[in-house]
Curated annotation (Swiss-Prot):
Organism: Shewanella pealeana (strain ATCC 700345 / ANG-SQ1)
EC category name: transferase
Organism domain of life: Bacteria
The protein's name in its UniProt record: 23S rRNA (uracil(747)-C(5))-methyltransferase RlmC
GO BP term, pick one: rRNA base methylation
EC number: 2.1.1.189
MF term (GO), any: rRNA (uridine-C5-)-methyltransferase activity
Binding-site residues for [4Fe-4S] cluster, renumbered to this chain: 3, 11, 14, 87
Lineage, highest ranks first: Bacteria, Pseudomonadati, Pseudomonadota, Gammaproteobacteria, Alteromonadales
UniProt cross-references to InterPro entries, sorted A to Z: 23SrRNA_MeTrfase_RlmC (IPR011825), MeTrfase_TrmA_AS (IPR030390), MeTrfase_TrmA_CS (IPR030391), SAM-dependent_MTases_sf (IPR029063), U5_MeTrfase_fam (IPR010280)
Record-annotated active site: 336
Catalysed reaction equations from the record: uridine(747) in 23S rRNA + S-adenosyl-L-methionine = 5-methyluridine(747) in 23S rRNA + S-adenosyl-L-homocysteine + H(+)
Amino acid sequence: MKCAHFDQQQCLSCRHIKQSMSVQVAAKSQVLSQLLSDFEVEQWHEPVFGPDSGFRNKAKMVVLGAAHQPILGIVTPTGEPVSLCDCNLYPEDMQLLLHRLEQFVRQAGIPPYNVDKAKGELKFILLTRSQIKGEYLLRFVLKSHKSIERIERELPKLLSEYPQIKVVSVNIQPVHMAILEGEEEIFLTEETRLSEQFNDVPLFIRPKSFFQTHPQIAAKLYQTAREWVAELKPSSLWDLFCGVGGFGLHCASKTIPLTGIEISSEAIACAKISAETMGLTQVDFTALDSTGFAQGCDATDKPDVVIVNPPRRGIGESLCQSLSDFAPKAILYSSCNPHTLAKDLANIQGYHIQKVQLFDMFPHTDHFEVLVMLVKPS
């Protein structure tokens, strides 16, 4: 992928952009192999990768500059603001909309938040795109309520030009800290969620719910998990750190009870809608801490198969101990951090690694997703 911003040293996020995808994936595979070198792996599956441009479905833009000349992008290593509306990680239609949003901010006259002076109103613009319909969820992160009227004044014109914008909200983040969003979310549209679909599973996105940023690879990851779980013929499933339900809903059926646990109530609300849409009745999605949930269950509640998809910190020693004690016949672990994955695998007792597969969800970076299946020795 070519990038003028990288060539000019304005944005260095895609640090491996000059390497081919095959070289990038080979390097990531080597890292993963080294991190898991202390474990016996029965099957190494071929890495999965896809498009290296036009794939990303979410933009997190810092709003810089001034009200009369706003810039959506980042601050360069030398301290200059630069627009990233034409970043090639985004689909072309998304790039065009980002340029239009710069114009929107200018027309609305909203002063960008100046971190050094702690003045201004508009901190971030967050844009999420649904791959299934090309529809959008648009969020304005403001310091206060002062500029909401300005957004509402210009919004009808924007929505008439871009009817594919289905959800618009304002998030209030009042503190002078490096925090992306605050607690208060104000919807400016009747719709409050974005429709998406991976494979044959309907999924829904709300402003604060986590969602994978590379839809093509995420779909393959979910499908692989579905196939691996199907081989196990489970009688019951847990999906911990379930988010909007992507893994569990791919693996569940009308005859297999599924328990999904996620700390975000917004994500759980989306997961419940998906389950209802799919006609799944033996499903229980609950907003709880996954570690606390597992610790509060007794042996009679233990699942046949457990899926975990934790944040970068991993599942931690307590949950590793709970899983070891429950001793399900298999554990599927999807990780975005191979370092914490290796640490957790060492703390889960009584299993061997049957399968490992790398999914390159983050081209041009050092990051990747990995799916591991742990089974009890026969």
